[in-house]
């Protein structure tokens, strides 16, 4: 690893001080960062139907000062979409087979197919467009990007969570579209234990094969909601 010269350290210190001073003067606003967001409604069609509203937020740093500084960040707000069935509720999580970022990136690309997928600059461009006043986008979410679906054998026992095959419960289509509606909340009314849950539902090291853990050892409360307390 190379060393940093005193001159460069001093320069970084001056830049940091200037950025900090400007940030304080603007009441906490970073003058080098833009933010954008949009909301979308996800609607499930099939034997069981339902919908929920989510919000995607993104930040874009206009001026990257340091080599290891990221060009921006992103996150998803919302809660698992709940579908009512005769055998109990199903939950479409805030992640697909990849991750939470995998889900909202897939939704964003489905709504802006003309913008190439991948890379923060492309993602920022898409979110910025979808958050505009005239945004009116609607699309089918490809099946390979669908959220993970789970149910609980016992709603009062997080360890009883199990994965559900969408075809087995009659899910045929998922549609996403931009909206100005409020983000869906209220999942704690169904899962009263969720807000106090710490870590994964089952400790990963406690399962027979930690390299191939059950879904209960992978999931945590933030896969169900971003709107509950820590």
Residue ranges and their predicted role:
Residues 26-28:
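C-terminal motif of bacterial Sec signal peptides marking the signal peptidase cleavage site
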Residues 30-32:
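Bacterial signal peptide processing site
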Residues 34-46:
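Alpha-helical transmembrane signal-anchor/signal-peptide segments
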Residues 153-230:
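Glycine-rich, aromatic-bearing surface loops/beta-hairpins
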Residues 1, 9-15:
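N-terminal export leaders
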Residues 49-160:
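Structured domain cores in non-transmembrane regions
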Residues 18-24:
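Hydrophobic helical h-region of N-terminal Sec-dependent signal peptides
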